[in-house]
């Protein structure tokens, strides 16, 4: 992308990168590192025409989270939205950041978590 002078990278993190959660130290810290990598790459590759951003999803209803059952709903209830996201809601944020409509967005970490990290 940098050789062509155009492109967009959208990393996918997690809301758990923004606050401590019991039992999530390794996962959360690795995703917090991804947030910093997003910003560092934005600084490094932005001048070469490549935008780098990240989406940090909250609880999301997927095949992978189906086994969580009611725990997913309880986790989501802690956010202002009060419900889990659909995979489409997360995908829409990724598509937006990858699109030309986000052409002036560099190094952003977008929480798509129903407001959990805000409240």
List where the protein language model places each region.
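Active-site "substrate specificity/gating" loop of NAD(P)-dependent dehydrogenases
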Residues: 20-24, 29, 46
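C-terminal substrate-recognition "lid" of short-chain dehydrogenase/reductases
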Residues: 6, 83-112, 117
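A glycine/serine/threonine-rich, flexible loop-to-helix segment
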Residues: 47, 57-79, 89, 119
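Residue(s) in the substrate-gating loop at a strand-loop-helix junction
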Residues: 14
